[in-house]
Amino acid sequence: MNVFEPRLSSWLENAGDDDDVVLSSRIRLARNLKDEQFPIYEQKEEIVDNIAEVFDDNFILIKMNQISLLQKALLVEKHLISPYMMNKSEYGAVLLNEEENVSIMLNEEDHLRIQCMTPGLRLFDALEAALQIDGYVEEKLSYAFDKEFGYLTSCVTNIGTGMRASVMVHLPGLVTTKRIKSVIEAIRSLGFVVRGIYGEGSMPASNIFQVSNQVTLGKTEAEIVEDLTQVMEQIIMQERVARTTLKQKFHIALEDRVFRSYGLLMNCRIISMKEAADAISDIRFGVELGFFEHISRQKMNELVLFSQPAFLRREAGRDMDELEEKVIRAKVIREILGDK
């Protein structure tokens, strides 16, 4: 297993429920050890070693102080560690399974952050996997837990279940019909948060949004997941209605937009990350509308992941200036799209 190879994690490679709109679902559990200090002002490598001993050979341990900055960036682009861990966690580490659908960050903001990812809208599957791992760890180690407040975490907004449930969605229909603002306002009024593809601190871009719960205290994990699932089902329905309306009323204009983006990516020699991401979003839109029978959702995920800066540096085998990065990105995109 080489996590730094250019390959998709299982949750990006496999099909899932409602995956014409939903790219992935994720459950993250924040936990701290009973007898260790948190928030983590002074990171201790022995905490990593003690937790890692609990897991068997089905997981590999990657310590942040033993890998390069490029390798850390690759893990961020694959959503296996957070940007916070890449930049701030000198004695942090991550435990990964072979399918890369389970990632356990150690010494991030909390001692453990267990995250499980699934393709499509499968929050309950992700929750079941996360709770199974959580229960296994709790049999071996004592968590910081309060009868009144629940699991104690470094950030007060995580106290209670310590759980963040999130769903990544592609909403070009709602963006194009200019209904996205009212939808986001409705989501927020229900107590959920809308962010960009890399979660906290990132802004939505290229029609991709991450929706997650805000409340972790006073509800069970299952109740939070059920609430978010119901919200997502409404968003999915509205996005599909918007797509159908656009296809019926503006078919030629929509085809023109999608095929222009396809022509751009098939023929470009220099392309920025934003221009590529916007064009990839258009083509994914076209795939879901039935304009491209030869392009799979898996190929779309390859385009998104392998056009990111760290993967391009890995492809080139060296650091690059801005122009070189744009040239390599164009080459990689042409190769992926041309591989039928």
Curated annotation (Swiss-Prot):
InterPro entries per the UniProt record, alphabetical: Arg_Kinase, ATP-guanido_PTrfase, ATP-guanido_PTrfase_cat, Gln_synth/guanido_kin_cat_dom
Keywords associated with the record: ATP-binding, Kinase, Nucleotide-binding, Transferase
Pfam families: ATP-gua_Ptrans
Function: Catalyzes the specific phosphorylation of arginine residues in proteins.
A GO MF term: kinase activity
Binding site for ATP: 24-28, 79, 113, 164-168, 195-200
Stored CDD domains: bacterial_phosphagen_kinase (cd07930)
Organism: Listeria monocytogenes serovar 1/2a (strain ATCC BAA-679 / EGD-e)
Record-listed E.C. numbers: 2.7.14.1
Similarity field: Belongs to the ATP:guanido phosphotransferase family.
Xref: Gene3D superfamilies: Glutamine synthetase/guanido kinase, catalytic domain (3.30.590.10)
Record domain Phosphagen kinase C-terminal: where: 21-242
GO term, biological process aspect, one: phosphocreatine biosynthetic process
GO CC entries: extracellular space
Catalytic reactions of this protein: L-arginyl-[protein] + ATP = N(omega)-phospho-L-arginyl-[protein] + ADP + H(+)
Gene label: mcsB
PANTHER family (UniProt xref): ARGININE KINASE 1-RELATED (PTHR11547:SF38), ARGININE OR CREATINE KINASE (PTHR11547)
Protein name: Protein-arginine kinase
PROSITE patterns: PHOSPHAGEN_KINASE_C
